[in-house]
Amino acid sequence: MEWEALVERARGGDLIAYFGYGSLVNPATHRTNVLHYERAQLRGFKRSWQERPDVGTEPVALLSSAPSSRDDLLDGLLVFDFSENLPLLDEREYGYDRLSVTPEDLKLYDDKALPEIPLYVYSGRLPQKVDAPHYILQSYLDAVMQGYLHQYGEEGVRNFVERTARFDTKLFADRASPRYPRYVSLSESEQYLFDQVTSFMSTV
């Protein structure tokens, strides 16, 4: 959808936007009728890997964000969607709190003015108890890094790794048999790049 048409559509009061900083940066993982997305930067949040014992039957770590210093900046994707899809989005982001953010917290990369609609970001709830070491599914990480590659180039992938805390979490190499439900297909060059930038990680 063209930007002018989106702004006009927003006046109807049935649109929302949410900031993606992990798998949502990759449009191939979107499962609702998304209208539009824009590269954006969120101020005042940090990203890290977080144990998620509440998800599925295996001890996975997923990306989370949390409010932090106003000096902290996250690159990501601002996704414009219908407000009626919020229940589906909340279901996808099970175990995350949907936080409201303001236009002052968000900056589009081409300096477009944001329409007056509700703006959100999802922040993972801290687990009450962690009984075992958790790991990162490579199929999940691939989806995230492909999103950053397509939106921000190779530098964006490297910045994602450098600016995400707890990347010492171990990797579970499931690329050949993906366990992440919204896994993506990679080109040979993407596989090479992603393996290169994560070569420091230990595997389980």
Task: Please annotate each region the language model reported.
Residues M1-V204:
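A glycine-rich, hydrophobic/aromatic-adjacent loop/helix-cap motif
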